[in-house]
Amino acid sequence: MEYKIVNLSQKPEILDRAARWFHEKWEVPLEAYRESMEESLLKKAPVPQWYLALKDSEIIGGMGVIENDFHHRKDLAPNVCAVYTEADYRNHGVAGALLDYVCRDMKEKGIDTLYLITDHTSFYERYGWEFYCMVQGDGEPQMSRMYIHRG
């Protein structure tokens, strides 16, 4: 299966479509995605960044890098967020390829350490991530797993 991974800055014309795609997957307000993506295009700082896996023009996967993914440990930053692969494309290495691309891209931008929150217990280890600690999500009753990736 052929697909291409891009930073949104390489295809700014799909910003609105990308914001809607993430909004539909995660139910975070559309405007929050749009604002973060617009900020990423200004290139004033390495964070935020948004990445997409594209099969032709279809978005089949994506993720972002933001300062804080809605948790109380503001010192654990930046965070990979909104990791999602369309169901028809799971188990084809899309998320792993996105993670590798994001880690390399952020390292080129001077950021060696990334964090992410997940409920998954074995997926991210395959890609060099390590369990770091439990964190309290904003408004969440349960603690969540925080992973770290050191470049």
Protein language model regions, located:
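Conserved beta-strand in the GNAT
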Residues: 52, 58-68, 79, 84
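Short coil/turn motifs at secondary-structure junctions
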Residues: 68-70, 88, 121
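Conserved acetyl-CoA-binding loop-helix of GNAT-fold acetyltransferases
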Residues: 85, 91-104
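Short amphipathic alpha-helix that is part of the acyltransferase structural core
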Residues: 1-37, 45, 50, 54, ...
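Short hydrophobic/aromatic beta-strand or adjacent loop that forms the aromatic wall/cage
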Residues: 48, 141-146
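Conserved active-site alpha-helix within GNAT-family acetyltransferase domains
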Residues: 108, 112, 118-142
